[in-house]
Amino acid sequence: QAMGIKPRTEKKLAGYSSWYNRYQDITEDTIREDLTGCRSLLCPGDLFQIDDGWEPKVGDWLETDAQKFPHGLKGMVQEIHASGFQAGLWLAPFVCEKDSALFRQHPDWLLKADSKPWCCGSNWSSFYALDIDNPAVLDYLRRVFDRVLNDWGFDLVKLDFLYGAAPFGSAHE
């Protein structure tokens, strides 16, 4: 009050993330199961977030894992919205895994350290940083967010492993 800050009047965002229940073990069916369970627990407007495991490999953000999500994510978003929730999606936009299509097809998109792709960290496997100074990488990222937000219709993205865009040491080549 002394600073003249008004109390927050809007409800804080609450919701569900598939990560803590399923980790990467998600499919269309498990997401539907969780969505059914959340209908009695969450309030209209709350968030229902699909976390890691929807993508073929970390870094391959323009498509879904066809075995887990044979109908893609647009229909999942429609089901989430029909349940009264906002739809969220997990992304780690600045990194990729070594066995991703992105790593294989675009080695020139990777940040280098000592002339090799810079391994900037790991989760289940090593992550390699994208060179965000490369115009082709920036174009790719624009396409990723356009697809996720506009084509598939997600309302929110949870961004993870952002340190990939903050190189240090010899990764400044």
What are these regions (language model features)?
Residues 1-46:
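Carbohydrate-recognition beta-sandwich/jelly-roll modules
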Residues 44-173:
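Aromatic- and carboxylate-enriched substrate-binding clefts and catalytic-loop regions
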